[in-house]
């Protein structure tokens, strides 16, 4: 099972969605796209070749409304950054291994088109934070390739890149 909906009162399964992409580390979210309730699932289980991406499901039935492939061609890659609802028709998803981040535009029939792609704004185990028209997050997989970055949502331009250095046993320099 890739994802399942459970009844909050008794814990029984309401529906399951089977998909070759499989389950991932990313938490599904509920949001609205064009005023319709949807569940966004970033799916990427164990598979050779590696495959996965964004599944858009009806949260009442589990029916697939749309899908967008977005996963590196590396077996060990994971999708762990939770999808981020940006507006009534935009969602940001991320892969840190090869692809980076992508802002997705949704039409009313749930056709998905990338607004922009940014290779070096790939989140690994975190979801970026949206503040105004900007995303802030630690892009990269681990030290030493991780940087604090700020990205303009309108055009995908990276505005800030800070090589935050970690010191063993001390606070992060430059942040606190």
Label the predicted regions.
Residues 1-176:
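Noncatalytic, solvent-exposed loop/strand surfaces
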